């Protein structure tokens, strides 16, 4: 059975101590266990906010056909603001990347050394100063991210003999949720529009926001406000397996 996962850093286990607990790594193992089949998996970090996302998707799909495709919808393209994105727009991508590499080195020697103390406070102060003096921008506009997601959903809907599962985006957690609260109305509209596109084309939609709200302490299920913890990953896999058990020919015994 051929499985395509159009995932992200979260599906690959970013932030987890054990990346095998990430939903994108758990899913193939569970599919193999439940179906008794060998799972040939293509697992990508795929972001719809990039300029080449549509052409890249065509190259990936050309390696099919796939029995199952799972596409993770993300809003980070327009919700996550950064100084390096603004510098990149003003002075060019190369300068933006150079600035980002410098910030990463600074973070390595300050913020990432520990959770408490003056070092972390100095890191936060430096980032705040940069945000206030230089400004921030998203990776792409809301309109661009939305249109690309609609085009991707439409393209996946044209696949024949393929079970397509669309994973809806989740709101960010913890401190990050406060930082991006101004974009919340856009996120809710974005989620509703992409969901409507998926359901109109008879694709399976899994509401990850609703899954997150089932936890007693939602913020505790994130490792950093953006990436999810092990229990959340497990819940995503259970939801995917649940819909596939009802609808996938591969799992219901009528595989081609």
Regions found by a protein language model. Give the residues of each.
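Alpha-helical cap/lid subdomain in secreted, periplasmic
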Residues: 55-230, 234-255
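Serine-esterase "nucleophile elbow" of acetyl-processing enzymes
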Residues: 1-47, 51-65, 69-70, 228-229
């Amino acid at each position: 059975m051929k499985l395509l996962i159009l995932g992200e850093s979260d599906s690959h286990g970013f932030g987890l101590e054990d990346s095998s607990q990430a939903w994108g790594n758990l899913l193939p193992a569970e599919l193999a266990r439940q179906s008794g089949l060998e799972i040939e998996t293509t697992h990508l970090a795929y972001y719809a906010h990039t300029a080449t996302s549509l052409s890249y998707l065509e190259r990936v799909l050309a390696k099919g056909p796939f029995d199952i495709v799972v596409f993770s919808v993300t809003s980070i393209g327009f919700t996550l603001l950064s100084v390096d994105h603004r510098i990149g727009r003003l002075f060019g991508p190369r300068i933006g990347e150079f600035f980002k590499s410098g910030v990463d080195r600074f973070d390595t020697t300050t913020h990432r050394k520990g959770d408490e103390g003056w070092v972390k406070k100095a890191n936060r102060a430096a980032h705040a100063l940069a945000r206030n003096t230089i400004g921030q921008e998203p990776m792409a506009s809301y309109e661009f991210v939305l249109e690309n997601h609609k085009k991707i959903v439409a393209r996946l809907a044209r696949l024949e003999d393929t079970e397509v599962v669309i994973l809806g985006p989740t709101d960010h957690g913890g401190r990050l949720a406060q930082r991006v609260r101004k974009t919340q109305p856009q996120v809710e509209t974005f989620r509703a529009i992409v969901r409507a596109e998926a359901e109109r084309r008879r694709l399976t939609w899994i509401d990850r926001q609703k899954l997150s709200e089932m936890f007693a302490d939602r913020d505790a299920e994130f490792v950093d406000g953006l990436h999810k913890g092990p229990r959340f990953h497990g819940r995503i896999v259970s939801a995917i397996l649940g819909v596939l058990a009802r609808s996938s020919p591969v799992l219901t015994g009528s595989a081609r």
